[in-house]
Regions:
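Solvent-exposed, flexible loop/coil residues
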Residues: 15-16, 22, 52-58, 64, ...
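Short secondary-structure boundary segments
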Residues: 29-40, 71-89, 157-158, 204-210
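His-Asp-centered catalytic microenvironments across diverse enzyme cores
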Residues: 2, 6, 10, 98-212
Length: 212
């Protein structure tokens, strides 16, 4: 069963660049320590940016996220899963609907809602159990929004905080869609088209403004 969560997929793909990134950042004596090291490399080394052209599958592909040095939650989750698999750690991508109470005016205007469907996270098989890790928001972005960056120790689930440092509502998990061997891109794109029609159709040349 775990072989499927070690294999490369179309979006949780494996390239020489991903293998090199994983080899460079997988530091530690055991799988848990290496997974933690990879988590921080993806969380902080790849900038979070939701202003992408989601009609292009490249927004969801791990190798493309690594090449650009930025991505949104699903793309960053794909990259962490890819790196973990390259290091021999079984990994799968999880998807959930969340309500983000602390978004930017520009993003809220484009999306038309604070509901984020198909938010991406990762589950890693460590010390005999699946553990959740959420590498989406890099430290610099969290500091800007006064949200504690998510830490990960490889033993406890790491999901978004319910409140920020000022005790304002931050992230509210509404529905979990389960976990996947690879990213169900067509399913996500179809839902994005239905819910975020203007945002979905935004082209990259019109999306140069950084999120944070």
């Amino acid at each position: 069963m775990n072989e499927a969560f070690l294999a490369a997929g179309d979006y949780v793909d494996r390239t020489p660049e991903i293998e090199a990134f994983a080899e460079k950042h997988a530091r530690g004596g055991d799988a848990r320590e290496r997974a933690v090291s990879l988590y921080y490399a993806v969380r902080d080394g790849i900038r979070y940016n939701p202003f992408l052209d989601f009609s292009k599958s490249s927004a969801f592909r791990a190798s493309e996220v690594l090449a650009k040095g930025e991505g949104f939650c699903v793309g960053k989750a794909a990259l962490l899963a890819s790196c973990a698999r390259a290091d021999g750690i079984p990994a799968r991508v999880g998807l959930a609907d969340v309500k983000n109470h602390l978004t930017t005016p520009r993003l809220l205007e484009k999306m038309g809602t604070d509901l984020f469907v198909y938010h991406g996270y990762v589950e890693l098989l460590l010390e005999g159990k699946w553990v959740k890790a959420t590498p989406a928001f890099n430290r610099a972005l969290c500091e800007k929004f006064r949200v504690r960056p998510l830490e990960f120790d490889g033993r406890e689930d790491s999901v978004f905080h319910e409140f920020d440092e000022d005790n304002r509502r931050h992230m509210e998990y509404l529905r979990d869609h389960g976990t996947f061997e690879d990213i169900p891109v067509e399913r996500i794109q179809q839902t994005f088209r239905e819910i975020y029609s203007d945002f979905y159709e935004m082209k990259e040349d019109a999306a140069k403004e950084s999120f944070g």
